[in-house]
Regions:
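Active-site-proximal substrate-binding groove within the catalytic cores of carbohydrate-active enzymes
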Residues: 1-136
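Non-catalytic C-terminal accessory domains or segments of carbohydrate-active enzymes
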Residues: 45-48, 67-71, 105-213
Length: 213
């Protein structure tokens, strides 16, 4: 439903909804964070045979200039399948930009140079393709499926970026260089860096982060 860009339906019985499964798709006030277009199959899935059994079904959609790809493999599939995400199968990527791929399940990022993944029967994987914006590139709030929909870029420059949070959670961005400094409108910053991936823990809706080199 999240990748479709459409409404979100809940069919649980009264009192049986698990809130932890809803928070990744909503803002603090209950508004749905959804993609801005209609979910469509990637071009390779249009002509492939036995999709969902021998090849994952991949659906893509957009939020801003980020592209989200969800991959699905039917439970009746006999084994795990290896597949790839190619820019040529994603209309809108023919601009010569550099891209990152963020794996929402592994919480890991790679610079796009062709992307291969493995999916098991019954699994659904979510990948976020992010155009590089220089020294700093926003991923967004990683506790939300549509991560960049939960944070707003107020300013993007070579040596400074300003982001405003639209929900609570953990904010993540990519830094190509060392020596990154982050300040917050709250005065408190819990910054964790793992390689190029930087995470500011426990941000709040309305909080503004300023990142400088």
């Amino acid at each position: 439903r999240v990748i479709s860009g459409g409404p979100l339906y809940i069919s649980d019985g009264l009192g049986k909804t698990d809130p932890e499964k809803l928070w990744p798709v909503i803002f603090n006030d209950g508004t749905i964070i959804r993609c801005q277009d209609v979910g469509r199959p990637t071009l390779d899935c249009l002509t492939a045979g036995n999709v969902m059994k021998e090849k994952p079904l991949k659906i893509y959609n957009k939020y801003g200039d980020h592209i989200y790809v969800a991959a699905f493999l039917d439970r009746s599939s006999l084994k795990a399948v290896k597949d790839e995400i190619l820019l040529k199968d994603l209309p809108g990527t023919e601009n010569g930009k550099e891209w990152y791929v963020y794996d929402h399940k592994k919480k890991a990022v790679d610079k796009y140079d062709g992307f291969t993944y493995e999916i098991k029967p019954g699994e659904a994987n979510l990948y976020q393709l992010i155009p590089a914006t220089g020294k700093f590139t926003m991923v967004g709030l990683i506790n939300k499926y549509i991560s960049n929909g939960a944070a707003e870029e107020k300013r993007v420059g070579d040596d400074i970026c300003i982001w405003e949070m639209k929900a609570d959670g953990d904010f993540r961005f990519i830094a190509e260089e060392d020596g990154v400094k982050v300040t917050s409108s709250t005065g408190k910053v819990n910054l964790i860096r793992e390689g190029k991936l930087c995470t500011v823990k426990n941000v709040k809706a309305g909080e503004v982060l300023v990142c400088r080199k």
